[in-house]
């Protein structure tokens, strides 16, 4: 038997041995609504609270909706979200095929209990991503069995056929799409070489055809920036009158300067929720390699680069292992304290539909260097007043902007203070909840969506 085949069989057996059925957490009943408020079914196909912004959005938005008097029950697939008291929770069973420490695992036979399980697994075997499809089918069945318990469904970026079915069946429905995932696909393909890798990248993003098809049928879509609104209209074909803008927020009582935290000279910080080209870590690392020639600096990366991936390989190639530290799994307060130690925070993304890391750093009064990719200029504000903006994918521009801030303590303090004030005035979860609730009211009363919220 060829060694490669023996190795494949051994790895498959090991995966089977490690596989265990998903243990569902207990359902948590939501607090009842106040008079005149809505009963909301909030859907998120994966609620991971530590990786990406979707779990953060879910936790803070649902908490503030409950504070407004609404009753909110979150339906989530694994990994499960962190939710606050008063927010209901119903787990939606899934195979969790990408979980740590066994991503792309082969489930045990006992885990296959429905057609959705089989579909999700077969899509993965075909190099695709089947979670949105399978989750939408599962949650559609669950909601149909509970018709009459909810006034409105709020789906967060699943856009599978089950969501379209809910809309066809007459459920009042609001869709949140943070930015067009077509951009992720384009950037991923631009940074992929080799026929096989390009093929598998296209296969992975195969769910986009489904999402675009579903999205065009939905009557109301909320997005988080004016740039995303324009791009969703242009790239995904959603009419502008079906789109409105409600920005995300930050808890500025947690993300704030802490008097006991001491600045570390030359400390830089970047937060990257995923190890993908769109986050711009490679151009930043190239800039760091140039900056270290003349300066004593170090970089904290909040995130977990893939072993052997593009970011890890770049750190090794540029000899940056002694000044780059990666940290993951921190709490919000720990993250805020890490920001407080930094002299400069960087958001080097090639594109962002909004950017939680930008407003988290600004709320901590840390001066931000960000690119002009996507909505970042909307979020950060005028370059030179509330932050510094540079072209995306430009290491030399990053060197100049970071160096300018490191050399000018007065400018750091000025931009940090103005940035925090901008966030407090514009980007809070209370503002997000009020804007979202206004969308619910418009949908339930048959009115057009509210006007997009201004960032100025």
Where are these regions (language model features)?
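Short hydrophobic beta-strand element within catalytic cores of glycosyltransferases
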Residues: 367-370
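Conserved donor-binding/catalytic core segment of Leloir-type glycosyltransferases
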Residues: 261-288
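Nucleotide-activated donor-binding/catalytic signature segment of Leloir-type glycosyltransferases, i.e.
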Residues: 311-333
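Carbohydrate-associated surface elements
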Residues: 227, 249
């Amino acid at each position: 038997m060829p060694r490669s085949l023996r190795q494949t069989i051994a790895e498959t057996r090991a995966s089977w041995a490690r596989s265990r059925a998903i243990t569902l957490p207990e359902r948590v009943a939501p607090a009842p609504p106040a008079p005149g408020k809505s009963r909301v079914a909030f859907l998120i196909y994966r609620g991971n609270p530590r990786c990406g912004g979707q779990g953060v959005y879910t936790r803070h938005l649902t908490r503030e909706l409950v504070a407004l008097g609404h009753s909110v029950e979150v339906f989530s697939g694994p990994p499960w979200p962190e939710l606050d008291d008063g927010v209901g929770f119903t787990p939606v069973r899934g195979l969790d095929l990408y979980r740590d420490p066994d991503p792309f695992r082969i489930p045990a036979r006992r885990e296959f209990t429905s057609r959705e399980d089989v579909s999700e697994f077969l899509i993965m075997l075909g190099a695709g991503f089947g979670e949105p499809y399978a989750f939408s089918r599962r949650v559609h069945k669950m909601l149909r069995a509970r018709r009459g318990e909810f006034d409105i469904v709020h789906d967060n970026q699943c856009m599978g056929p089950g969501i379209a079915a809910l809309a066809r069946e007459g459920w009042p429905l609001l869709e949140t799409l943070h930015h067009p995932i077509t951009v992720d696909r384009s950037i991923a393909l631009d940074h992929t070489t080799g026929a096989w890798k390009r093929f598998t990248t296209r296969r992975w993003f195969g769910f986009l055809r489904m999402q675009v098809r579903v999205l065009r049928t939905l009557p109301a879509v909320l997005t988080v920036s004016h740039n995303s609104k324009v791009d969703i209209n242009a790239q995904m074909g959603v009419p502008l009158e079906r789109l409105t803008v409600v920005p995300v927020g930050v808890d500025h009582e947690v993300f704030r300067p802490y008097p006991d935290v001491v600045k570390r000279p030359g400390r830089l910080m970047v937060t990257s929720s995923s190890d993908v080209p769109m986050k711009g870590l490679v151009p930043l690392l190239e800039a760091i390699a140039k900056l270290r020639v003349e300066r004593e600096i170090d970089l904290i990366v909040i995130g977990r680069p893939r072993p052997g991936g593009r970011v890890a390989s770049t750190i090794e190639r540029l000899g940056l292992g002694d000044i780059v530290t990666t940290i993951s799994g921190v709490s919000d307060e720990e993250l805020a304290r890490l920001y407080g130690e930094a002299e400069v925070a960087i958001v080097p993304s090639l594109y962002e539909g909004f950017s939680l890391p930008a407003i988290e750093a600004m709320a901590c009064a840390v001066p931000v260097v960000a690119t002009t990719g996507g909505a970042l200029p909307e979020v950060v504000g005028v370059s030179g007043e509330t932050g510094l903006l540079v072209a995306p994918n430009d290491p030399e521009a990053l060197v100049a902007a970071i160096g300018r801030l490191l050399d000018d303590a007065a400018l750091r303090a000025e931009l940090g203070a103005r940035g925090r004030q901008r966030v407090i005035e514009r980007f809070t979860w209370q503002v997000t909840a009020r804007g979202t609730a206004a969308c619910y009211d418009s949908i339930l009363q048959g009115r057009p969506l509210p006007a997009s919220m201004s960032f100025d």
